Design a protein with these regions (language model features):
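Alpha-helical transmembrane segments of multi-pass membrane proteins
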Residues: 94, 125-139, 165-185, 211-219, ...
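Interfacial loop-to-transmembrane junctions
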Residues: 433-452
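Membrane-embedded alpha-helical segments and adjacent helix-loop junctions characteristic
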Residues: 31, 48, 61-62, 66-168, ...
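Transmembrane-helix bundle segments that line or gate the permeation/cavity pathway
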Residues: 148-153, 157, 172-200, 220-246
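Helix-coil boundary and interhelical linker segments in multi-pass alpha-helical membrane proteins
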Residues: 205-212, 394-406, 465-466
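Hydrophobic transmembrane alpha-helices of multi-pass small-molecule transporters
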Residues: 1-93, 215-352, 448-454, 458-466
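Interfacial segments of multi-pass membrane proteins
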Residues: 70, 200-208, 436-439
Length: 466
């Protein structure tokens, strides 16, 4: 789940439960001598933030400010030390990537891409479904999945109206395909969705492991493609086999504008630099080049390259009202909390108390983790779930002598496998808001895909450890 609004019944208890649990730490002394006072109060802050994040008592972005307020007061860390993670380089990767996405939307390059694919697809209902899912998948790698779903919804409605399909279920399946494609596409790249960005920052901040754009996509891209094809097979099986062929009437593509060409060139150069950064850093002048640096460089040029209207640039600062500034605080708050867990000794204490897990097989523990995360993310924010679970999962990985990076990657991708409910992801919510899909229809297809995703992720885990 990624939308902020929950029922009032959840909000009020969540606020008081978090506050009461936090207050209890002031009246209970730590039983373990290995747990320092700093670690004890970090545990108190973590408890408060996790409860408020999971129940969304107040905005998850506001909750992310708590480390800046409480950690300098309750622990030996000063404000500057706590504030440093709020400027983690991963946050600048997010900002640069999102600014590039805003430019793509501004010149309607994404719509051109969508119509280009549709104008070259087949005439069967299955090929139409596949085309829309591929468009949603590829677009949401770079553009926020909510915008992807909103862009494709009217196009899909138009296509369904012009095909006059004899299969009454086709429109429902097509809209679900858009939602699923948009959600799955976000898994494939670092900038595709918030949990990916947070995880990369978490690994760099706490384990000095720097995951490049290429390294992430090397694992996540094929994995997401397998999930995408599974989603297509699930949905296409419900299409009436006796349906006739249809010709899609699409808007005739005009010649690319100069603005579209300029943004497309910057986009291609940015992707190329991300993919081939390893080769670029062999050049002495570029030896310190990072994915974040590439993203910010691309964003910078979008603000200085003139548009067709010579009085303006491709992007202006007023375009930045679309930037989700709250996510910057959310990443910073999560990274600040994670860093304090590590530096205070709380991480070691948690690890020591999880030693009993070593008696169980890694396969069983990962299976339980994946099942819990996939079904919890149907009702909880996938970002909040990642923020809350990642420090604990890291300690489990260390106890089991497993790669923190590997187990964390499985967790993060599982957090995006939410296909059952309208509240599970923004694309689901957008499609449901069209009024053309019932909850039962979404849940019926979604639970099948959830179960398939469990098997795919476990298979991926087995492949990685081998």
């Amino acid at each position: 789940m990624t939308n902020e609004n929950t029922t009032q019944a959840i909000k009020k208890p969540g606020f008081w439960i978090g506050l009461i649990l936090f207050t209890c730490f002031f009246f209970i002394s730590p039983e373990s001598a290995s747990l320092t006072q700093d670690a004890w109060f970090v545990l108190a802050v973590m408890t408060l933030m996790v409860v408020w994040w999971l129940t969304e008592t107040i905005s998850i972005y506001v909750t992310a400010l708590i480390p800046l307020i409480l950690l300098p007061i309750l622990t030996s860390a000063n404000f500057q030390e706590v504030a440093l993670p709020y400027a983690n380089q991963t946050i600048f990767l997010f900002l640069g990537g999102f600014i590039l996405a805003i430019a793509i939307e501004k010149v309607n390059l994404h719509k051109r891409f969508a119509y280009f694919i549709l104008s070259r697809n087949g005439t069967t209902l299955k090929s139409i479904l596949f085309s829309f899912m591929i468009i949603a998948y590829l677009t949401s790698m770079w553009i926020i999945n909510t915008a992807t779903a909103m862009m494709l919804l009217p196009i899909a409605t138009y296509v369904c109206r012009t095909t006059n399909s004899s299969d009454p279920r086709f429109e429902v399946l097509l809209l679900l395909g858009i939602a699923y494609g948009a959600t799955i596409g976000g898994m494939a790249t670092i900038v595709g969705t918030a949990p990916n960005i947070f995880f990369v920052g978490y690994m760099a901040e706490n384990y000095d492991i720097h995951i490049s754009f290429y390294e992430w996509s090397k694992v996540a891209l094929p994995l997401s493609l397998v999930i995408l094809m599974s989603a297509y097979l699930v949905l296409s099986q419900s299409i009436n086999k006796n349906s006739t062929d249809h010709k899609i009437i699409t808007t005739k593509l005009t010649q690319m504008s100069m603005n579209e060409k300029k943004v497309a060139l910057i986009f291609i150069l940015t992707i190329g630099a991300w993919v081939f950064r390893g080769q670029l850093t062999s050049i002495q002048l570029l030896s310190n080049l990072t994915d974040a640096g590439i993203a910010i460089t691309a964003a910078f040029f979008l603000f200085i390259i003139p548009s067709q209207n010579k009085k303006k640039e491709l992007l202006e600062w007023r375009d930045m009202h679309q930037l989700p500034w709250g996510l910057v605080l959310l990443f910073g708050g999560g990274l600040a909390l994670a860093k304090s867990i590590m530096t205070s000794g709380l991480a070691n204490w948690i690890g020591n108390n999880l030693e009993f897990l070593t008696q169980y097989s890694a396969f069983a523990l990962v299976l339980i983790l994946v099942i819990c995360v996939i079904f919890l993310t149907e009702i909880l924010s996938n970002t909040a779930l990642t923020l809350s679970f990642l420090p604990i999962v890291s300690m489990v990985a260390i106890n089991l002598q497993m790669s923190v990076q590997m187990l964390g990657t499985i967790l993060v991708i599982a957090a995006s496998c939410a296909f059952m409910l309208p509240i599970a992801t923004p694309p689901n919510a957008v499609i449901f808001a069209s009024g053309k899909i019932r909850v039962y229809e979404m849940a019926k297809q979604g639970i099948i895909l959830n179960v398939i995703s469990i098997f795919i992720l476990i298979g991926c885990f087995q492949l990685l450890i081998s």
